């Protein structure tokens, strides 16, 4: 079964995960609950697997609205302990979860982000069209991600500046992403 996403407000998280999710799991006699966002229900005996991409909110709690930060920091350690298994996207995040939440490393699987098979190399003429559109035909480095200070874009710009200073190159830097908590 697939459940519709819960509301994205911390006051509603509790109701969703402690009432709605357990009721749906019971109704459908589910054997496992997979949460791709890391949230779990503390109110069900059904086995659960959480995907915790990172726990950056532990290190930078001010990057989130106050209620969200409090909810995450209070509950994610509990979710990590409750989960039958955890998945995360890097060895760094795994180590962070192990150290911060005192979870055994054997409980955590590192599963790297995948790429849909629809994404494949472009034909040469299409590559040239893209270059002409975005960089007047120049080669480029591409950053795709949330535009947020925790994504370290300042160092990306410094690194690109260093590259340009050390190489006689017409390479451009393209930055693509959604402004999130922009300051």
Predicted regions located by residue number:
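Carbohydrate transferase catalytic cores enriched for Leloir-type hexosyltransferases
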Residues: 1-183
């Amino acid at each position: 079964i697939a459940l519709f996403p819960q509301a994205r407000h911390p006051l509603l998280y509790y109701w969703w995960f402690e009432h709605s999710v357990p009721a749906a799991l019971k109704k459908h006699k589910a054997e496992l609950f997979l949460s791709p966002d890391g949230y779990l229900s503390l109110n069900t005996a059904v086995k659960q697997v959480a995907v915790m991409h990172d726990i950056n909110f532990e290190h930078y709690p001010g990057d989130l609205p106050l209620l969200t930060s409090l909810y995450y920091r209070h509950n994610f350690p509990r979710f990590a302990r409750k989960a039958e298994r955890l998945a995360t996207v890097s060895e760094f995040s795994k180590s962070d979860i192990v150290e911060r939440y005192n979870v055994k490393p054997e409980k955590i699987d590192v599963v790297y982000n995948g790429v849909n098979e629809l994404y494949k190399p472009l034909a040469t003429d299409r590559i040239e069209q893209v270059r002409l559109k975005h960089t007047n035909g120049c080669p480029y480095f591409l950053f795709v991600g949330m535009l947020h200070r925790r994504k370290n874009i300042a160092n990306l710009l410094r690194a690109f500046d260093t590259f340009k200073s050390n190489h006689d190159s017409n390479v451009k830097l393209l930055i693509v992403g959604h402004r999130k908590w922009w300051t």
